[in-house]
């Protein structure tokens, strides 16, 4: 059977509209978890204020020089802040991926579904999803740091891995290998969706500061919720595409 991107886009749009409230609640809950965890594990405001003390920002030619000019205590605070942001983001993304994929599975099986039920049903696979998303993010970030393009290619090639891990109960590395092979064979169907997702995320990041006009916490939750909705659309598309490819 010939698969067209247009038909998959149409199926994705229909599913997203029909399950919008459930997906919105999952996205909002994941955003709230991300913000709360980030706040809990981040340095205090007083510690963050120390990052500006005695650091010659104008004379630094890059991030590496800026970090080198920091005191050991400031470097530790920066490391803690970065780790808190990364960890909370990975947790939120893992719960989002598990919840959205379980919504699709439960709805496809004709069962009633709620946001809490979907997240609860995804609990057994969350540790594996967390590790998978961590490894994927690491590879993509390394690729982007090198020449940008390798990172984008890795993001495309590994896009189907979460779906395979949950749907086919594959191992972490098996799902990554299978995703690379299957995506490479169907690049014309996967690449445009992933590139659109990356573009939407980038645009959201550019306008993220405007959300802080409310309060930093509410702005962070709103920005993360929108980001999660964008990711949810991509997950629905990839799940539908994967099921069609397997037929």
From Swiss-Prot:
Alphabetically ordered keywords of this record: Cell inner membrane, Cell membrane, Membrane, Transmembrane, Transmembrane helix
TM ranges: 20-40, 87-107, 118-140, 152-172, 187-209, 225-245
Source superkingdom: Bacteria
InterPro entries, alphabetized: UPF0259
Localization per Swiss-Prot or TrEMBL: Cell inner membrane
Pfam families cross-referenced by the UniProt entry: UPF0259
Keyword Transmembrane: yes
Cellular component terms per the entry's GO annotation: plasma membrane
Membrane topology: Multi-pass membrane protein
Protein family membership: Belongs to the UPF0259 family.
Name by which UniProt lists this protein: UPF0259 membrane protein YciC
Taxonomic source organism: Escherichia coli (strain SMS-3-5 / SECEC)
């Amino acid at each position: 059977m010939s698969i067209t991107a247009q038909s998959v886009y149409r199926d994705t749009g229909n599913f997203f509209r029909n399950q919008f409230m459930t997906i919105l609640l999952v996205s909002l809950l994941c955003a709230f978890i991300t913000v709360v965890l980030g706040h809990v594990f981040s340095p205090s405001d007083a510690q963050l204020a120390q990052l500006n003390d005695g650091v010659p920002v104008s004379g630094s030619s890059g991030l590496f020089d800026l970090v080198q000019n920091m005191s050991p205590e400031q470097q530790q605070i920066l490391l803690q802040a970065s780790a808190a942001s990364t960890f909370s983001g990975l947790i939120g993304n893992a719960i989002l991926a598990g919840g959205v994929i379980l919504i699709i599975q439960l709805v496809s099986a004709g069962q009633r579904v709620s946001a809490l039920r979907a997240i609860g049903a995804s609990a057994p696979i969350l540790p594996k999803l967390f590790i998978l998303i961590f490894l994927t993010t690491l590879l993509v970030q390394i690729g982007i740091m090198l020449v940008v393009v390798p990172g984008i290619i890795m993001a495309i090639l590994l896009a189907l891995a979460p779906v395979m891990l949950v749907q086919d109960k594959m191992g972490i590395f098996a799902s990554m290998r299978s995703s690379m092979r299957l995506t490479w064979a169907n690049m014309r169907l996967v690449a445009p969706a992933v590139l659109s997702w990356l573009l939407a995320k980038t645009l959201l990041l550019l306008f993220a500061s405007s959300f802080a006009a409310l309060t930093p916490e509410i702005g962070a939750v709103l920005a993360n919720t929108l980001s999660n909705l964008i990711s949810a659309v991509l997950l629905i598309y990839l799940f539908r595409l994967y099921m069609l490819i397997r037929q």
